[in-house]
């Protein structure tokens, strides 16, 4: 058997059966070979394993005896011991050579493969080896790192060999030294992988009896024929090892590339702890998508209740609000790669069910304290033992509740030469809510008088007033809204709600980005709410059977007649004027003249809630109204219904239509804001589109769109199924939106 100690290195032959060394040294420049008495294995570079082809058996006489097997047993043993000692002496000498070559690998990350130091490692230095260059020439000088790259690719080649190969003799415990020097710059490794693959010859080696060598050499082993004391690895183990070595033990580069940043998203609500609408969903999902791209991400939200996941980190700070000192406590948890920090204070507590409760001044004081505490989180909260700091940092503020954050960043810090490398981005989710009040409210925000002009606004109806959203839009480094359509509407006098002039002046830093869907929570294939009560999980392949079963289960649960041929029309949302519930109410008599069922889920205005109850009483076999909100029922209605209505008068983005399409439910929407961006109207001529839209918030327009939808459902099943499948096939995840947010953050980072 031959032991290879490196590239083009000295090879030690020894017997394959008795594992006894011969002092003869020879140079090996071949692939895989067997001769009488010699078993030759292949070097795998990483784990230093040996193998041989199936059906090939290395048998022969002991090297301690002659060809005829003459010689005493004692002489053979003594000769073997002496030869083993010589091998160990050679290995000790080579260990010393390793120390001299450490300078050659100083640029290599020592964390690539643990275990280099402290292990008995030896391999022969070679004056002729592969060059570090990605296109090596024959005879060029070599560095240690290039040799290791070669060995790394040898291992890949070995582990991809046929499963029918039988693994040969045990590996020599020489592997730690081969492993460490493999982590390189991505460009070097990629080019080496390209050019070395065809040029490298596998080197061969064997190991002596584990009883006769030091423990530093006795590491992993493989079974060779009837050799006792070794275990043959399964093909699964070999595949796992190959996968680990192919990755080199190093993480893939972040999707963000060199633009990795510290990102802190600040929001007054964050699902699943606090939520009143889409803002909570965005705050709970966008940070996770940004973290998957390689950024260090934190969410900051008020501590409204006792959250089991978060723990008090022992940091106390005091801030002045309207002349009164208030103490805050920071709670922290880490979930899905995101640091989550809750700011606790008595004025936030016990508001879980009504987070925007209280009068105007109560809400204003809460938001002033929240923004003051949030802007200092990167200094005071050691997440994982290390604070975020103010370098390479971007804040993402959301709606008027946190629009004071970019103002405080400017007034308290950047105007005084602090946090110069920190940027702020303000996201508009709903510009109808602006934090307006009398000018006297400026005294509550604790700023000097020279910042008053940022907050002053004038409109023909209310006159001069105090406006927090206006100040945030003026001071933020970048502005984002939640869809392209809504971005266009905000620049108009009708859609900008008095702030359109500021937005038009800031057009250079303004962008629309469509929200995504949290596919972990909203995925019919894994939805936890569809695993009981007759519901079932389904995917694109099982759409028709799965949705049919969910529809029947929903009808049974709500007490409606179980009829497969009747379409279920649904509405899920807030009961108010914005959502167009009054348009649905106006269209209900027309709907009831057709063979349909209507399911509505939501809460809001008392008069609209009462109206739903009255309609259910009048049409108890066709209408079900669920006054209130239930996450479980929202999922089940989305899965079991055929059509979703969204007649919103304005809709910045909208999430329910995205959820519906993900579940194979067809949306019928008013073409405004994000609804226009996300729902492509069905075209029967080229079989394109994922739903129906109508252009004005009028009941007759809603009925016309719904009529076309019902006609397609009943008479054109093939087209209907195509609409469902196209909706489910879309990539609606947050990953696309996160990439676009990243572009905005990078632009803010380099903005001066």
Curated annotation (Swiss-Prot):
Superkingdom, natural source: Eukaryota
The name this protein goes by in its record: Granule-bound starch synthase 2, chloroplastic/amyloplastic
Transit peptide: 1-57
EC number, as in UniProt: 2.4.1.21
Pathway: Glycan biosynthesis; starch biosynthesis
Presence of keyword Transit peptide: yes
Location(s), subcellular: Plastid, Chloroplast; Plastid, Amyloplast
Bilayer-spanning residue ranges: none
One CC-aspect GO term: chloroplast
Catalytic activity: [(1->4)-alpha-D-glucosyl](n) + ADP-alpha-D-glucose = [(1->4)-alpha-D-glucosyl](n+1) + ADP + H(+)
Family affiliation: Belongs to the glycosyltransferase 1 family. Bacterial/plant glycogen synthase subfamily.
Keyword Plastid: yes
Expressed in which tissues: Widely expressed.
Class of enzymatic activity (EC top level): transferase
GO molecular function: alpha-1,4-glucan glucosyltransferase (ADP-glucose donor) activity; alpha-1,4-glucan glucosyltransferase (UDP-glucose donor) activity
Region entry Disordered, spans: 116-146, 224-253
Keywords: Amyloplast, Chloroplast, Glycosyltransferase, Plastid, Starch biosynthesis, Transferase, Transit peptide
Binding site for ADP-alpha-D-glucose: 275
GO biological process: starch biosynthetic process
């Amino acid at each position: 058997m031959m032991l290879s100690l490196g590239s083009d290195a000295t090879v030690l032959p020894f017997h394959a059966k008795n594992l006894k060394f011969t002092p003869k040294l020879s140079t090996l420049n071949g692939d895989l070979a067997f001769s009488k008495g010699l078993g030759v294995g292949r070097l795998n570079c990483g784990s230093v394993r040996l193998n041989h082809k199936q059906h090939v058996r290395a048998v022969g006489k002991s090297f301690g005896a002659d060809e005829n097997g003459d010689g005493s047993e004692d002489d053979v043993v003594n000769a073997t011991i002496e030869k083993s000692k010589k091998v160990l002496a050679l290995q000790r000498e080579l260990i010393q050579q390793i120390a001299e070559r450490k300078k050659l690998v100083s640029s290599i990350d020592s964390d690539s493969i643990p275990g280099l130091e402290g292990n008995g490692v030896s391999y022969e230095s070679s004056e002729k080896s592969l060059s570090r260059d990605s296109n090596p020439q024959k005879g060029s000088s070599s560095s240690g790192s290039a040799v290791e790259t070669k060995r790394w690719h040898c291992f890949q080649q070995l582990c991809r060999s046929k499963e029918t190969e039988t693994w040969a003799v045990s590996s020599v415990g020489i592997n730690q030294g081969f492993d460490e020097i493999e982590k390189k710059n991505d460009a070097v490794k990629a080019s080496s992988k390209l050019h070395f693959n065809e040029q490298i010859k596998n080197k061969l080696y064997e190991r002596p009896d584990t009883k006769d060598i030091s423990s530093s050499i006795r590491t992993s082993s493989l079974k060779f024929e009837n050799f006792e004391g070794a275990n043959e690895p399964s093909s699964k183990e070999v595949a796992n090892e190959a996968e680990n070595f192919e990755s080199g033990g190093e993480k893939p580069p972040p999707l963000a590339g060199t633009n990795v940043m510290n990102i802190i998203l600040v929001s007054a609500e964050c699902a699943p702890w606090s939520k009143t609408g889409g803002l909570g969903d965005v705050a709970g999902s966008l940070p996770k998508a940004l973290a998957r791209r390689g950024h260090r991400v934190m969410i900051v939200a008020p501590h409204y209740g006792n959250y089991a996941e978060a723990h008090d980190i022992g940091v106390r700070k005091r801030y002045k609000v309207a002349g009164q000192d208030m103490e805050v406590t920071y709670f922290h948890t880490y979930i899905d790669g995101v640091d989550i920090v809750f700011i606790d204070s008595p004025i936030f507590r016990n508001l879980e069910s009504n987070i925007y409760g209280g009068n105007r001044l109560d809400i204003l004081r809460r938001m002033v304290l929240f923004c003051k505490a949030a802007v200092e989180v990167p200094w005071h909260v050691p997440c994982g033992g290390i604070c975020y700091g103010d370098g390479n940092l971007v804040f993402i503020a959301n709606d008027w509740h946190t629009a004071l954050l970019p103002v405080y960043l400017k007034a308290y810090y950047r105007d005084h030469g602090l946090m110069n490398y920190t940027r702020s981005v303000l996201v508009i989710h709903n510009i109808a809510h602006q934090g307006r009040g009398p000018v006297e409210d400026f005294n509550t925000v604790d700023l000097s008088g020279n910042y008053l002009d940022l907050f002053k606004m004038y409109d023909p109806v209310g006159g001069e007033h105090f406006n927090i959203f206006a100040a945030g839009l003026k001071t933020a480094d970048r502005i984002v809204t939640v869809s392209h359509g809504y971005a266009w509407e905000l620049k108009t006098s009708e859609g900008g709600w008095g702030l359109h002039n500021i937005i038009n002046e800031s057009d250079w830093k303004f962008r629309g980005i469509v929200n995504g869907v949290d596919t972990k929570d909203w995925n019919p294939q894994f939805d936890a709410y569809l695993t009981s009560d007759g519901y079932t999980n389904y995917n694109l392949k099982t759409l028709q059977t799965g949705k049919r079963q969910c529809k029947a289960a929903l009808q049974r649960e709500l007490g409606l007649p179980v009829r497969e041929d009747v379409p279920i029309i649904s509405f899920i949302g807030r009961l108010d004027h914005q959502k167009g519930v009054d348009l649905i109410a106006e269209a209900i008599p027309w709907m009831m003249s057709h063979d349909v069922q209507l399911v509505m889920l939501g809460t809001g205005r008392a008069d609209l809630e009462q109206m739903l109850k009255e309609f259910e009483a009048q049409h108890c076999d066709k209408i079900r109204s669920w006054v209130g909100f239930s996450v479980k029922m929202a999922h089940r209605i989305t899965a079991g219904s055929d059509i979703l209505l969204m007649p919103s008068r304005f809709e910045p983005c909208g999430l329910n239509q995205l959820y519906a399409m993900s579940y194979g439910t067809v949306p019928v929407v008013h073409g405004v804001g994000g609804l226009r961006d996300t729902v492509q109207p069905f075209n029967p001529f080229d079989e394109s589109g994922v739903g129906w839209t109508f252009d004005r918030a009028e009941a007759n327009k809603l009925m016309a769109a719904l009529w076309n939808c019902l006609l397609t459902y009943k008479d054109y099943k093939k087209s209907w199924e195509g609409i469902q499948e196209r909706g489910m096939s879309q990539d609606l995840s947050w990953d696309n939106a996160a990439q676009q947010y990243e572009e905005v953050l990078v632009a803010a980072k380099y903005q001066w």
